[in-house]
Design a protein with these regions (language model features):
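Transmembrane alpha-helix interface/packing and boundary motifs in multi-pass membrane proteins
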Residues: 24-38, 68-80, 155-160, 253-263, ...
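Short helix-coil transition sites and intra-membrane helix breaks within transmembrane domains
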Residues: 30-39, 77-88, 120-124, 259-268, ...
């Protein structure tokens, strides 16, 4: 009992709560700005923790992480501009709500789903972290390849009514990902100048395809009176929405947690896998892509589930689940702490304070989210003549901020033109982003697995985890083909 009270006292001390609140608020603002990812936010604000105690510093960084993943949904819903890669799936359906005057409802669904996904990941963090972390360590190159292939199969389900167009777009995304230095042989591929040696970055491409293309489209009718309905009819989800959220978000939150445990698989993958799972569970899969509450709930539950999942291997094994967790390891090291099994023995109170702090951060996030929905939706009442230049500026700043490279700005502009042209011929842009994100992961692990096995393809059928992913791939493809035949 004294241990539990010590944990509660540590997590709920006024100073720690203040730092967590500040972290969540900063994270939401960072996440809502296109191009400023959760990783960038945590990295930029890491120096602020140097003078803090370990508990305050780590929980403030966790607050930034939780807030940024949720914050990406705000611009995704209001402007069709994912603030972070984790919200790319949210933009598909979320923006459809805004177009029909239901932005408040969509933000409410996203906020509650984010909270539920985060809470599910916190429960997993508390209850089964050691066991799940051990499972994640069993992932070899073969398992990572099949995970990436499973993610790529989602392209078939997010392609809308024309699977062929979606598959072509996804293939182009994969092809784009091959530009740069080969990760296995270091051979230079498809590079015209030094700027392409590191490859085509997916964040400028994502900003271009989603945001800049939308800005170009807006320019065409900038003086028209056909504005998006900015009225806020609801600030909370309907009863039916809540039922949908309670059915979908816990499942996708659990999926996101499992994805987060796997090193290298981030919130963007958790979001798309959750989206695809919900589509398979839905009685009305044809509504996905047209403004489905299930779709928004699934995406946000999945990406916020990753936040707790990524902490599991970090704390129990000292292995980062994603880039943010890697920064967290650095923050702990600065405090003189070494993440891993010994941390549970030497600093048990701190570990369980982090567990409880994740729950508190998610609670602060949901309270801030619902409190500010009306403020968020004011963006829609801004005239197009003002909003469009602002979107242009955000796109330029967001694409430049990642590497401070104007070449990325050019990449974003080219992607924007391509996305605008794709919209003209009704080709979905989401498959290209998915291909660009998962293509390198699939290629690298496919080739590494074959190198380790001396070219024997049996390596992809050796373990129960491989068979599990093969079954998921078959199920996903079967469902997509059956849906197209109908």
């Amino acid at each position: 009992m004294s241990f539990f009270l010590e944990v509660v006292q540590s997590a709920f001390s006024p100073m720690v709560l203040f730092y967590m609140f500040a972290g969540v608020a900063a994270g939401i603002c960072i996440g809502a700005l296109p191009g400023l990812t959760a990783t960038m936010g945590v990295a930029l604000l890491l120096p602020l923790t140097f003078g803090m105690d370990a508990t305050s510093g780590i929980l403030m960084l966790l607050g930034i992480y939780v807030g940024a993943i949720y914050g990406g949904s705000i611009s995704a819903i209001l402007l069709h501009t994912p603030g972070t890669p984790a919200s790319a799936a949210t933009a598909i359906d979320g923006y459809q709500f805004s177009k029909r005057g239901e932005a408040g409802r969509a933000l409410g669904i996203a906020t509650l789903s984010s909270y539920i996904g985060g809470v599910v990941s916190c429960l997993c963090l508390w209850l089964i972290s050691p066991q799940l972390a051990k499972l994640a360590l069993k992932f070899s190159s073969a398992e990572f390849f099949l995970l990436a292939v499973f993610g790529l199969c989602i392209i078939a389900n997010i392609s809308g009514e024309n699977m062929a167009k979606g598959l072509i777009c996804g293939f182009l995304g994969i092809l784009t990902a091959t530009v740069g230095i080969d990760s296995v042989t270091s051979y230079i591929r498809f590079t015209d100048n030094a700027n392409l040696l590191s490859g085509i970055q997916y964040i400028p491409v994502m900003i271009g395809l989603f945001a800049m293309s939308q800005a170009f489209e807006t320019i065409e009718d900038i003086y028209s009176t056909d504005e998006i309905d900015a009225s806020v009819t609801r600030l909370l989800p309907t009863k039916e929405d809540v039922k949908t959220i309670l059915r979908v978000a816990p499942v996708t939150g659990l999926i996101g947690t499992m994805i987060g445990i796997i090193p290298g698989a981030g919130a963007d993958i958790g979001s798309f896998v959750g989206y695809n799972t919900a589509r398979g569970m839905s009685k009305h899969p044809e509504q996905f892509g047209k403004g489905s509450p299930e779709a928004v709930a699934a995406s946000e539950g999945g990406n916020n589930g990753v936040t707790g999942g990524a902490m599991i291997p970090m704390l129990t094994l000292g292995v980062p689940g994603d880039a943010v967790a890697a920064i967290m390891i650095g923050a702990l090291t600065i405090q003189g702490l070494t993440p891993g099994p010994m941390l549970f023995k030497t600093n048990k109170v701190l570990v369980y304070t982090i567990f409880l702090g994740m729950f508190v951060a998610n609670t602060i996030m949901v309270l801030l989210g619902f409190s500010c929905i009306r403020l968020f939706t004011k963006v829609l009442s801004v005239p197009k003549t003002i909003l469009t230049p602002v979107i242009f500026i955000l796109c330029v700043v967001g694409s430049y901020a990642m590497r401070s490279n104007f070449y990325d700005v050019g990449t974003m502009l080219i992607a924007g033109v391509i996305g605008w042209l794709m919209g003209k011929v009704k080709i979905p842009t989401s498959p290209a982003i998915l291909g660009l994100i998962l293509g390198p992961m699939a290629e690298k692990n496919f080739r590494t697995a074959l190198l380790k096995s001396s070219g024997n393809p049996v390596v992809f059928f050796n373990t129960p985890i491989c068979w599990f992913f093969l079954a998921l791939i078959a199920f996903t493809l079967f469902g997509a083909i059956r849906g197209q035949l109908k």
